[in-house]
């Protein structure tokens, strides 16, 4: 971790930190700095893992296109089936939220039916009671 920093440099940094921060705040400062370093390492590792995964996916796509260009007619049925499964998996990853045409035509949840009983209003009676 400290490739270019020797023991004397670390000792000097520790003494300066002790003088500047004091013995009460130095352990807290060291803990917060190590927490930041851990968070940065975690973030860098997650970015690296995502990039590696994307590169693997791109390599699979390139291999699939290369196999298609060489001709799929000469392949065995098992290999053809696995390529078809790979294509389906790639399409499902690329478009996970795409709906089928059959799902668009038929709603999954039916709207509630309105069963409101109509009551006749007696507007003439209310006006006559208020007026007289």
Swiss-Prot record:
Membrane topology: Single-pass membrane protein
Keyword list, A-Z: Cell inner membrane, Cell membrane, Membrane, Protein transport, Translocation, Transmembrane, Transmembrane helix, Transport
Taxonomic superkingdom: Bacteria
Molecular function in Gene Ontology: protein transmembrane transporter activity
Gene3D superfamilies: 1.20.5.3310
Compartments, record wording: Cell inner membrane
Principal subcellular localisation of the protein: membrane
GO-annotated biological processes: protein transport by the Tat complex
Biased composition (Polar residues): 86-95, 116-132
A Pfam entry, by short name: TatA_B_E
Membrane-crossing residue ranges in chain numbering: 2-22
UniProt-annotated stretches for the region Disordered: 86-132
GO cellular component: TAT protein transport complex
SUBUNIT field: The Tat system comprises two distinct complexes: a TatABC complex, containing multiple copies of TatA, TatB and TatC subunits, and a separate TatA complex, containing only TatA subunits. Substrates initially bind to the TatABC complex, which probably triggers association of the separate TatA complex to form the active translocon.
Role summary: Part of the twin-arginine translocation (Tat) system that transports large folded proteins containing a characteristic twin-arginine motif in their signal peptide across membranes. Together with TatC, TatB is part of a receptor directly interacting with Tat signal peptides. TatB may form an oligomeric binding site that transiently accommodates folded Tat precursor proteins before their translocation.
Family according to the record: Belongs to the TatB family.
Name this protein carries in UniProt: Sec-independent protein translocase protein TatB
Species assigned in the record: Shewanella denitrificans (strain OS217 / ATCC BAA-1090 / DSM 15013)
Source species taxonomy: Bacteria, Pseudomonadati, Pseudomonadota, Gammaproteobacteria, Alteromonadales
Gene name, Swiss-Prot/TrEMBL: tatB
